């Protein structure tokens, strides 16, 4: 995975820089997401690593994408096809979205709780995380009854485990050592 990310990063960075310059970050995110879905299609996957010439592959891929990808997006796809990198489109799209969130000072936080959180609780968590991370936070909430009580928050590299299950696990580990 690290190798794919290394290969995809320059394409994502170039697309992101261009999108910022043209004030089209959202439309580029949509284009790259669509192209990534096309590249993951079961019919398309064998063609990406197949024996088609790069220009034929680019024409085919752009034809499948149709109006969903503009002229500049098509140019990116042609360059990627020439370099045999179309299979990295999902990673390019993911990196682009990460750059978009970083640029917009946004972060997604996953909150797993033992019971459903009220809108007030979600608001409190969101405000606290925004202060701590100095970013706009989008919460993705889910329920896992095995936590017993409390919650686990994951936002980027930050993990806060305030669940009873986590506390019992840490207590068990400390008693065993």
UniProtKB/Swiss-Prot annotation:
Keyword DNA-binding in annotation = no
Keywords, sorted A to Z: ATP synthesis, Cell inner membrane, Cell membrane, CF(1), Hydrogen ion transport, Ion transport, Membrane, Transport
Write out the annotated subcellular location: Cell inner membrane
* A single cellular component GO annotation: proton-transporting ATP synthase complex
Q: Does the keyword Transit peptide apply?
A: no
Q: Which GO terms describe its molecular function?
A: proton-transporting ATP synthase activity, rotational mechanism
Q: Which InterPro entries match?
A: ATP_synth_OSCP/delta_N_sf, ATPase_OSCP/dsu
Q: How does it sit in the membrane?
A: Peripheral membrane protein
Q: How does it assemble?
A: F-type ATPases have 2 components, F(1) - the catalytic core - and F(0) - the membrane proton channel. F(1) has five subunits: alpha(3), beta(3), gamma(1), delta(1), epsilon(1). F(0) has three main subunits: a(1), b(2) and c(10-14). The alpha and beta chains form an alternating ring which encloses part of the gamma chain. F(1) is attached to F(0) by a central stalk formed by the gamma and epsilon chains, while a peripheral stalk is formed by the delta and b chains.
Tell me the protein family, please. Answer: Belongs to the ATPase delta chain family.
Q: Which PANTHER family match?
A: ATP SYNTHASE DELTA CHAIN (PTHR11910)
Q: What does the function comment of this entry state?
A: F(1)F(0) ATP synthase produces ATP from ADP in the presence of a proton or sodium gradient. F-type ATPases consist of two structural domains, F(1) containing the extramembraneous catalytic core and F(0) containing the membrane proton channel, linked together by a central stalk and a peripheral stalk. During catalysis, ATP synthesis in the catalytic domain of F(1) is coupled via a rotary mechanism of the central stalk subunits to proton translocation. This protein is part of the stalk that links CF(0) to CF(1). It either transmits conformational changes from CF(0) to CF(1) or is implicated in proton conduction.
Fetch the HAMAP family from UniProt: ATP_synth_delta_bact
What is the protein's given name? ATP synthase subunit delta
Give the originating organism: Shewanella woodyi (strain ATCC 51908 / MS32)
């Amino acid at each position: 995975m690290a190798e794919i990310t290394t290969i995809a990063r320059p394409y994502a960075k170039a697309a992101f820089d261009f999108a910022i310059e043209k004030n089209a970050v959202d439309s580029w995110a949509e284009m790259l997401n669509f192209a990534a879905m096309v590249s993951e299609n079961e019919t398309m996957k064998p063609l990406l690593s197949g024996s088609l010439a790069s220009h034929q592959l680019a024409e085919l891929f752009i034809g499948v994408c149709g109006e969903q990808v503009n002229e500049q997006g098509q140019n990116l796809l042609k360059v990627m096809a020439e370099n045999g990198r179309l299979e990295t489109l999902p990673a390019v799209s993911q990196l682009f979205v990460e750059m978009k969130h970083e640029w917009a000072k946004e972060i997604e936080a996953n909150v797993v709780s033992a019971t459903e959180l009220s809108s007030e609780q979600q608001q409190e968590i969101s405000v606290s995380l925004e202060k701590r991370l100095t970013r706009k936070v989008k919460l993705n909430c889910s329920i896992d009854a095995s936590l017993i009580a409390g919650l686990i928050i994951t936002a980027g590299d930050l993990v806060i485990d305030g669940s009873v299950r986590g506390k019992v696990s840490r207590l068990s580990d400390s008693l065993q050592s």
